[in-house]
Curated annotation (Swiss-Prot):
Binding site for substrate: E831, R909, F943, T1039
UniProt cofactor(s): [2Fe-2S] cluster; FAD; Mo-molybdopterin
SMART domains: Ald_Xan_dh_C, CO_deh_flav_C
2Fe-2S ferredoxin-type domain segment(s): 15-101
Subunit architecture: Homodimer.
Protein name: Xanthine dehydrogenase 1
Active site (UniProt): E1297
Length: 1361
């Protein structure tokens, strides 16, 4: 521990370092400088704070930090990412985690209660982070926050389950901004329509006035609830105050140590800092650790001396004077944002143009948690070439004031500060003291620019800062001075100096614009092999940004000088910002109650545990004594022969216990869910980057990772296949995977002249990362002297874990038990690819007879566990001049990766769904699974169905283009009908497609929306809108017949409560809740009397994975079967007496020695498709749906937003409408990510700047799932009414996967908008658009004068497929 000596140096005398956690005083020992706040909290047992990514990108680790501001003499509260915050950075502060709010026993905090009641928690892994972000906003706000502030505070939190709408609704009530918030149409903005339901007493949307067996949820009928309904009346605990001890405590310097020789210093004055810098010139200075922490964790960089400058007053100084504003380099970005907002309100408008630009740029800079700790100086001195702020400092005439260890101060213009890649004009004996920003002058304008993959919390692709100072010379304006700065175009932020020089002295008119654009092309040169790729896109953005700047300046000066040459009004949309509107939504459904619970919108059974952080996940399980931690040794090349494995360096690593390889496996090394075609540990050859070679165990997780990194593997590299097309050319297919489907006679149809027209083409689509918030993990231990093995795993398929471990260890399955309580999201990614993780951990556990815990880091999880398959479809389609489809000839390929896994089944479902909802008389489909040198791809929501349907919808769009008709017209004339026979010989029954489509078309007012989009497009050159409607038909069942079985175990206890155990896994989809509702209604008891226990292989054996959307059908039916068995046994007793309660009946049966336990079983009937004959039912039934979407794109940048989405599904009589609506919304937003945001970038021929076979996008920093700002502005969900499904339990239908594909409506709406943009330049022919439609693809498809210098009109960006 350290204190400040009289001579100003930090000494080694002990002084107590401390912090408060949830009101409890904690003394911090020396030796923890390597530890993050998250690790510390979880070591304390406060596991409600989750590790989702470890890089501050997901928000699952959010906590609130309170500190005392000695300037204002007040305590301040702010949200931080605990995964990045060094433990010692919060010394002397108060940390409040989710456990510090409310809990089930003493009452929930209003924020927790609201989220739980609003169905805002599904898997629950992200939930504590969202709650802490909202709680921090409330604690830090003097007044009720606005709706915009609420959504802004959540920008740093990701959710993969809900689609965000219920979260926004839950928190919006705290704005208290509108009395009509939950009362229908608001005077301020449309809201969601939640009400207190008289049937349940909980928030829903039914609007019903009475409790009926059948009630209709209708957006036109609302019952008011107010803030007081969730104001915490049941919350008996008190808010934690800022500890008085910390108010009085003097701030002292610190010197603390940590593992690996790290020393942490905290100086509290500038002089002390300069002395430390003189002694340790290579020390890393930090405030928030948002950059250094990632470098140390992901890049494994080692820094021996860390100096926290957050508490140095001189670096936090503010000085506002007549010339400008000077801000200290340690000032946090959130403080800078508040400061600029205050200045804009107080200073004359002409002085604050730069301040306004910074405000706009900071809005989109990272998330709130990062802005709360990241500082100005860190962002500047890191000198990232894609820094959002540095180009603005450069353009704004800012000066950086630098001091050396002697106290000498110098100033340097920001535009001269950056010398090269992460190199600045500052010596090792210097630090950045402050930044001076001058006021802008009359006729001086500063503007910010940024284009990223995602608006919220994303790094820039290209950004910029631009300034012009105009001089009024009568009827003309001349450029007196100019700055044009870009980021993302070179190894450093740079000024386009030739362009600046060219502009000065010129008349500000359209001729200058055209000439300047030519100069920029030669001034800003991006090399063709530049890291980051997207070269043509980035080049075009440099011109687009300048054009936008020129328009913006011209618009601003036009009112003051009418002589300025004006642009047409249609151009001005180019400078209008993306609106940040409140997200709203409505839900419309009928409630058909069956018994006490089925049909009711019951809240997720675990919701209250999840909102309090009490719900346990695999990594939260208390570890047994003597537990070891494991980490993988992974291949670093895509295809190679292993020459040697040297673990000598690992053996000397701290905490190392052992390295286990294939030779150590006691059982069989070959594994696989269907075909055992992959090795658990590679022996002679590796076939992908990330293939497991062995597993290291050590005393801690970090030590295991460090030791694994020291294992030296030498290779002889071999040729690698890195795309589907490379596989096709090399005939590289997995054995026995060619599949064929046939209907009618395709060749005869094409040759006979029946087809008026024939089109041929290709459709490519990329893969998708599951991005479940909880990474994969297992805890394995031995029992009874090592003769049995038990495990807790994050998996959708405990039986597969049991089977893999049994197989690898050579044990009978009866001696292996796998348990799963809940998982933090799965989406198919934990169906099979999680099993090898448990198997790998079981080897050292079994051999050492010690518990072993293996939790994957986010980057490793994304790299090795597989993704949604990328696909290639080659089609030939014949049709009439009217648009009637006659024939489809389709070759379809998926990228299986280096093992088969489930790729064949995925391919088969894609082939089944390649008709989508269309009647096609003649069909021939041939499918193949490609072997490539990538990690094996696997199941993902939809399981190939979305890929097959997306291929179909692409050629449907092309038919429409060929015939100059709307796509909707082509769809409607080709819809399947009741009795239609598919190309796999299944007859459609209870087909509700037409009814559903018609109702949606009316409710979304599609024709009006299209007219309005056309009208908008005619008046706006650079913004375009598009609308689209898409249908879906999703088959329900496993396509492998034997998997359509389910078991359950039901116990009735003498107190009248019921315990249910079944083979399905709760992963947020509400399966346990629905199953409990089935049991409650069966016994006619309250839902609170039913408890669903963990999924365990020793309770229900041989369970199929929780997948295929069929779990509610199967396990609900199995539970009902068990309940009915018990009811039948109880009936003789019940018929003889009138019992007042179920408990009385149970007690009587017990005394009559009646068995109150039953095993239920369900077999899905009438299934079994024969691929040889091409006959048989592949599915039990279909879930039909349709969606409408309206989007707006910025043709100059490729940015887009979804203005509206309306979704309608036929779910029969829903078991739980609220849960089903949540599944629909979540699937839609996840699908939106697939078609428009999420792009996997691999090292392949298309991305040569990435190491071959390696995944670049292996974390939230580079891979962008939708954030709260990406959900549609208006998201409406309706369930078709009055259509019970006779083929599933209680007339319901499956919901998990069917809505996913409906997000393609956004994709095709984008394409319609692009079509409008291309029409502006005379490009009216059909054009391909690959998925995902990222900003790069959108912008480059909108060919214009700003992209023409770099590409032709038929240019399409590369895609990893």
């Amino acid at each position: 521990m350290g204190s400040l000596k009289k001579d100003g140096e930090i000494g080694d005398e002990f002084t107590e370092a401390l912090l408060y956690v949830n009101g409890v005083r904690r003394v911090l020992p020396d030796g923890l400088a390597h530890m993050t706040l998250l690790e510390y909290l979880r070591d304390l047992g406060l596991t409600g704070t989750k590790l989702g990514c470890g890089e501050g990108g997901c928000g699952a680790c959010t906590v609130m930090v309170s500190s005392y501001d000695r300037k204002s003499k007040t305590s301040v509260h702010y949200a931080v990412n605990a995964c990045l915050a060094p433990l010692y950075s919060v010394e002397g502060m108060h940390v409040i985690s989710i456990e510090g709010l409310g809990h089930r026993k003493l009452g929930l905090h209003p924020v927790q209660e609201s989220l739980a009641s609003s169905h805002g928690s599904q898997c629950g892994f992200c939930t504590p982070g969202f709650i802490m972000s909202m709680y921090s906003l409330l604690r830090s706000s003097k007044n009720s926050p606005s709706e915009e502030e609420i959504e802004e505070c959540l920008a740093g939190n990701l959710c993969r389950c809900t689609g965000y709408r219920p979260i926004v609704d839950a928190f919006r009530v705290f704005a208290k901004s509108d009395d009509a918030l939950y009362c229908g149409v608001s005077s301020l903005s449309l809201q969601d329509g939640s009400t207190i339901c008289p049937s349940t007493g909980k928030p829903c949307s039914c609007g019903s006035k009475t409790t009926n067996e059948v009630a209709s949820c209708n957006e036109d009928r609302f019952q008011s609830i107010s803030y007081s309904d969730i104001d915490g009346a049941k919350y008996t605990d008190k808010e934690l105050i800022f500890p008085p001890e910390l108010l009085l405590r003097k701030l002292t310097p610190l010197k603390l140590r940590g593992n690996g020789g790290i020393t942490w210093y905290r100086p509290v004055c500038l002089q002390n800092l300069l002395e430390l810098k003189a002694n340790y010139p290579d020390a890393k200075l930090l405030v928030g650790n948002t950059e250094v922490g990632i470098e140390m964790r992901l890049k494994r960089l080692q820094y021996q001396v860390l100096i926290s400058v957050a508490q140095v007053p001189e670096l936090n100084a503010l000085n506002v004077n007549d010339n400008g504003i000077e801000v200290g380099s340690a000032l946090r970005l959130s403080e800078l944002l508040r400061l600029f907002r205050k200045i804009v309100k107080e200073r004359p408008a002409h002085e604050t143009s730069a301040c306004k630009a910074f405000i706009e740029q900071l809005k989109w800079f990272a998330g709130t948690q990062i802005r709360n700790v990241a500082c100005i100086g860190g962002n500047i001195c890191t000198a990232s070439p894609i820094s959002d702020l540095n180009p603005l400092w450069m353009a704004s005439r800012a000066e950086f004031r630098i001091t050396n260890c002697n106290g000498d101060v110098r100033s340097i213009p920001a535009k001269d500060f950056f010398l090269g890649y992460r190199k600045v004009d500052m010596g090792s004996n210097e630090i950045l003291l402050s930044v001076f920003l001058p006021w802008t002058r009359p006729l001086e304008y500063v503007k910010e620019f940024k284009q990223a993959h995602r608006r919220d919390d994303d790094i820039a692709i290209v950004n910029g800062g631009m300034r012009v100072f105009l001089e009024d010379k009568g009827q003309q304006l001349f450029v007196s001075d100019a700055s044009i700065a870009y980021g993302g175009v070179a190894p450093l932020s740079l000024c386009a100096r030739k362009t600046e020089e060219f502009l000065i002295g010129k008349n500000w008119n359209k001729d200058l614009l055209q000439d300047a654009l030519k100069v920029i092309q030669s001034d800003v040169v991006i090399k063709e092999d530049a890291p980051g790729g997207m070269v043509e896109f980035r080049k075009s953005l440099t011109l687009s940004f300048f054009f936008k700047f020129f328009l913006w300046v011209s618009h601003n000066v036009n009112n003051a000088n009418s002589a300025i040459e004006t642009f047409p009004p249609s151009h001005m949309s180019a400078v209008q910002p993306v609106p940040r509107l409140s997200r709203i939504g409505k839900q419309d459904y009928e409630t058909v109650k069956q018994g006490t619970s089925v049909g009711s919108s019951e809240v997720h059974l675990s919701a209250r545990m999840q909102v309090t952080g009490e719900a346990e996940y695999t990594d939260d399980t208390p570890v047994p004594p003597n537990t070891l931690h494991a980490a993988f040794v992974l291949s670093k090349v895509p295809h190679a022969r292993i020459l040697s494995i040297d673990d000598s360096a690992a053996k000397s690593s701290s905490g190392f216990v052992g390295l286990f390889l294939a030779k150590d496996i006691p059982g069989d090394n070959m594994i696989g869910p269907i075909v055992p075609d992959e090795e658990l540990f590679a022996t002679d050859v590796v076939t992908c980057v990330g293939q497991v070679i062995g597993v290291v165990v050590a005393d801690t997780h970090e030590n295991a990772k460090t030791a694994a990194g020291k294992v030296d593997v030498r290779y002889e590299e071999l040729p690698a296949i890195l795309s589907i097309k490379e596989a096709i050319n090399a005939k590289s297919f997995h054995p026995n995977t060619e599949k064929r489907l046939r209907k009618g006679d395709v060749e005869l149809c094409f040759q006979s002249g029946q087809c008026d027209r024939v089109i041929e083409g290709e459709v490519q689509m990329g893969g998708q990362e599951h991005f479940y918030l909880e990474p994969n993990g297992s805890l394995v231990w031995t029992v009874d002297g090592g003769s049995e093995v038990h495990m807790i795993s994050s998996t959708q398929a405990p039986q597969k874990h049991q089977k893999y471990v049994s197989h690898v260890l050579g044990l009978p399955m009866s001696k292996v038990v796998c348990k799963t309580k809940r998982i933090g999201g799965g989406f198919g990614g934990k169906e099979t690819r999680s099993a090898f993780i448990a198997a790998a951990a079981s080897v050292p556990s079994y051999l050492l007879n010690r518990p072993v815990k293996l939790i994957l880091d986010r980057d490793v999880d994304m790299m090795i566990t597989g993704h949604r398959h990328s696909f290639l479809g080659k089609y030939k389609v014949g049709f009439t001049n009217e648009g009637k489809i006659l024939a489809l000839d389709l070759e379809i390929y998926n990228n299986g990766g280096n093992s088969l896994d489930l790729s064949l089944s995925v391919l088969e479902r894609a082939m089944f769904h390649s008709d989508n909802v269309y009647e096609i008389p003649h069909v021939r489909i041939v499918g193949n699974v490609c072997f490539t040198n990538f990690p094996s791809n696997t199941a993902f929501r939809g399981f190939g169905g979305p890929q097959g349907m997306l291929i179909t919808e692409n050629w449907i769009q092309r038919i429409a283009a060929e015939l100059n008709k709307s796509p909707e017209e082509i769809k409607e004339m080709n819809f399947q009908v009741e009795g239609s026979v598919t190309h796999y010989c299944q007859t459609l029954q209870h087909c509700t497609l037409h009814q559903l489509w018609k109702e949606l078309k009316v409710s979304c007012n599609f024709l009006k929306a299209r007219r309005e989009a056309d009208e908008f497009n005619s008046h706006n050159r650079w913004k375009k809108r598009g609308v689209a409607m898409v249908p879906t038909k999703f088959g329900i069942s496993f396509t492998t017949k034997f998997m359509n079985q389910a078991g359950a175990l039901v116990h009735v206890y003498t107190d009248g409560t019921v315990l249910v155990t079944h083979g399905g896994v709760e992963m947020g989809q509400g399966l346990h809740t629905k199953v409990a509702q089935v049991a409650a209604s069966a016994f006619n008891i309250p839902l609170s009397s039913v408890f669903v226990s963990e999924t365990s292989t020793d309770k229900v054996p041989n369970a199929s994975p929780t997948a295929a959307s069929a779990s509610s059908d199967m396990y609900g039916a199995a539970v009902l079967d068990a309940c009915e068995q018990i009811i039948a046994r109880m009936e003789p007793v019940a018929s003889k007496h009138n019992f007042n309660t179920f408990t009385e009946l149970v007690s009587a049966c017990y005394f009559q020695r009646i068995d109150l336990s039953a095993h239920g079983f369900h077999i899905v009937p009438d299934l079994g498709f024969d691929w040889i004959s091409g006959k048989g039912n592949a599915f039990r039934y279909y879930t039909y749906g349709a969606a409408f979407a309206e989007v707006e794109i910025d043709t100059l940048t490729g940015d887009f937003h979804t203005r509206a989405a309306d979704i309608m599904l036929d779910l029969g009589y829903s078991l739980n409408p609220a849960i089903d609506v949540g599944q629909i919304e979540g699937a839609f937003v996840q699908g939106l990510g697939w078609v428009a945001l999420e792009e996997l970038k691999w090292g392949d021929a298309a991305h040569k700047w990435i190491k071959p076979g390696s995944l670049l996008t292996c974390g939230p920093g580079n891979y962008k799932i939708p954030s709260i700002n990406d959900m549609p502005f208006n998201l409406n969900v309706s369930l078709l009414k009055g259509n019970p499904n006779t083929k599933a339990i209680h007339s319901s239908k499956a919901v998990g996967e069917p809505p996913f594909f409906l997000a393609s409506s956004v994709f095709f709406a984008i394409k319609e908008a692009i079509k409008a943009a291309r029409t502006e330049v005379g490009l009216t022919d059909w054009f391909p658009l690959e998925s995902p439609a990222t900003p790069e693809r959108i912008r480059m498809a909108c060919f214009d004068e700003f992209s023409a210098p770099f590409v032709n009109s038929d240019f399409y960006p590369n895609l990893s497929v």
